């Protein structure tokens, strides 16, 4: 199964404290850490009846459009990725070596054996969410099963909170069909038409 997990307001939800601690654990220190700490320690004021109230700290959000934000988000997300890679209960496919996930922006493309692993995956994401602020948006997430077994498909469908994509799933602009022989028609031909327009 492939699960494309969409984050709920990915950049907006990351907790500053967790981000700074993660950077420190990864060996980022000195001037760079001080700059990040300063930029991501904003405060806000509310003006009520023309009177400025006491400032309060903003504790979450990596700034949209800020050049280091995608990198900072990826560094924070790597904590979850490492936990997934190291979790023995989460089974993965073998392509020369075990492949559990592929990360890009706020989507995690996760490839695994659903019957054994989905519960543990959701548990890890839930635990990570509590400390980092990262949450998944189930309506934005898709599961794609590479099986023609209807019984197995029904069982999996009942056990996961994601929408099931029946024929194909789109990842990084490429359509991944259920049948690999359709990959050329689904993606390559379509992309070539778009390029030649």
Predicted regions and their residues:
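Nucleotidyl polymerases of mobile genetic elements and RNA viruses
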Residues: 1-197
